[in-house]
UniProtKB/Swiss-Prot annotation:
PROSITE patterns: RIBOSOMAL_L1 (PS01199). Part of the 50S ribosomal subunit. This is Large ribosomal subunit protein uL1. GO terms for biological process: regulation of translation; translation. Belongs to the universal ribosomal protein uL1 family. GO terms for cellular component: large ribosomal subunit. It comes from Prochlorococcus marinus (strain MIT 9515). It comes from the Bacteria.
Length: 235
C-alpha cells in the first residue's frame, strides 16, 4: 500500500468520514489545493451499473457552463474540403488517409479525435490503437459528425466526453482550483444532471453509489448526491 506523504496525511485529517454538502465539499477541495500550480478538480463517481452489459453502458458528452480550464488538442479525420474547414475551425491535427496512417504508426499527440461519417470505415481499422485509450470516435459522443466546425468549437469551449469504466466509475475533470466555488458547483450540477438524464436503460437498484471530488494533489471529499440532485437555484 502506497504511503501517504506528510502533507496528504495532514490534509486528510481535516476531512471527516461523511458526506458533505456540495458547496462545502468544494470549499474544502479549494482550500486544500495549495500546490505550486493550478490544480485540476476532478469528480470520481461510482454508479450502480455493470458496463459489460450493453444496456448498462454510459457514454455521452456534457457542455460544462464554465468549461474545464484545460486546453485540449483535437485531431480530425475527414476528406475533401472538410480538411480545410477543420484547419480553420481550430483543429490541431487534420487530414485524410495520411492522418489515419500516422495514428496507426503511433502518433497519438491529441486528446480527442473527431471523424466525419464517410471516413469511419477507415477509422474503424484503428480500433486496436484508439480503443484502449478511449479515443475511438462515436456518434453518441458527438465525435462522429458532418458538422466538424461546430464540434471543434464546442469541445474547445469545454464540452467533454465521459464514460463509465469497466467498474462502473465515471472520472471527470470539471475545473481548476482557480475557479470560484460557484463556477465549480455549476459545472458539477451540470455533470450530475447529464448522468441522470443518460441513465442506462438496464441500470437496476441504486444508481448513485458514491460521489467524490478531489484535486490533483489533495485528498478526496465525499459529496452528498441527494443534496446535489435536490438543489434548486433561488428565483
Amino acid at each position: 500500500m502506497k504511503k501517504l506523504s506528510k502533507r496528504m496525511t495532514a490534509l486528510s485529517t481535516k476531512i471527516e468520514d461523511r458526506t458533505y454538502a456540495p458547496l462545502e465539499a468544494l470549499a474544502i477541495i479549494k482550500e486544500n489545493a495549495n500546490a505550486k500550480f493550478d490544480e485540476t478538480i476532478e469528480a470520481h463517481i461510482r454508479l450502480g451499473i455493470d458496463p459489460k452489459y450493453t444496456d448498462q453502458q454510459l457514454r455521452t458528452t456534457v457542455a460544462l457552463p464554465h468549461g474545464t480550464g484545460q486546453s485540449i488538442k483535437i485531431a480530425v479525420i475527414t476528406s475533401g474540403e472538410n480538411v480545410a474547414k477543420a484547419k480553420s475551425a481550430g483543429a490541431d491535427l487534420f487530414g485524410e488517409e495520411d492522418l489515419v496512417e500516422s495514428i496507426n504508426k503511433g502518433n497519438m499527440d491529441f486528446d480527442l479525435l473527431i471523424a466525419t461519417p464517410d471516413m469511419m470505415p477507415k477509422v474503424a481499422k484503428l480500433g486496436r490503437v484508439l480503443g484502449p485509450r478511449g479515443l475511438m470516435p462515436n456518434p453518441k459522443a458527438g465525435t462522429v459528425t458532418s458538422d466538424i466546425a461546430s464540434a471543434i468549437k464546442e469541445f474547445k469551449a469545454g464540452k467533454l466526453e465521459f464514460r463509465a469504466d469497466k467498474a462502473g466509475i465515471v472520472h471527470v475533470r470539471f475545473g481548476k482550483a482557480s475557479f470560484t466555488e460557484n463556477a465549480l458547483f455549476e459545472n458539477l450540477k451540470t455533470l450530475q444532471e447529464s448522468i441522470d438524464k443518460n441513465k442506462p436503460s438496464g441500470a437496476k437498484g441504486k444508481y448513485w453509489k458514491t460521489f467524490y471530488v478531489t484535486s490533483t494533489m489533495g485528498p478526496s471529499v465525499q459529496v452528498d448526491i441527494n443534496a446535489l440532485q435536490d438543489y434548486q437555484p433561488e428565483s
